[in-house]
From Swiss-Prot:
Cellular component per GO, a single term: cytoplasm
Coiled coil: 1-71
Protein name listed in UniProt: Cell division protein ZapB
Any single biological process term in GO: division septum assembly
Family to which the UniProt record says this protein belongs: Belongs to the ZapB family.
Keywords on record: Cell cycle, Cell division, Coiled coil, Cytoplasm, Septation
Source organism (scientific name): Haemophilus influenzae (strain ATCC 51907 / DSM 11121 / KW20 / Rd)
Main localisation: cytoplasm
Subunit structure, as described in the record: Homodimer. The ends of the coiled-coil dimer bind to each other, forming polymers. Interacts with FtsZ.
Subcellular location as annotated: Cytoplasm
Alphabetical list of InterPro entries matching this protein: Cell_div_ZapB
Known role: Non-essential, abundant cell division factor that is required for proper Z-ring formation. It is recruited early to the divisome by direct interaction with FtsZ, stimulating Z-ring assembly and thereby promoting cell division earlier in the cell cycle. Its recruitment to the Z-ring requires functional FtsA or ZipA.
Length: 72
């Protein structure tokens, strides 16, 4: 009887170890996805800043042209 209980316990331990290993793999995948998402965020923030600067430059250029029209 106790041998049967030990066999059951061993099987449960094996299942628990397998579950832990699968969860560890899933955690690693999620960490990789998180890192990729973080890189994408940084790239988008950089692009956003560049576009804001470009927009500002165009606004200044248009103001300058409008100022020249006012002087004519």
């Amino acid at each position: 009887m106790s041998l049967e209980i030990l066999d059951q316990l061993e099987e449960k331990i094996k299942q628990a170890v397998e579950t832990i290993q699968l969860l560890q793999l899933e955690v690693e995948e999620l960490k990789e996805k998180n890192a990729e998402s973080q890189r994408n965020i940084e790239n988008l923030q950089t692009e956003n800043e560049q576009l804001k600067n470009e927009h500002r430059n165009w606004q200044e250029h248009i103001r300058s042209l409008l100022g020249k029209f006012d002087n004519v």
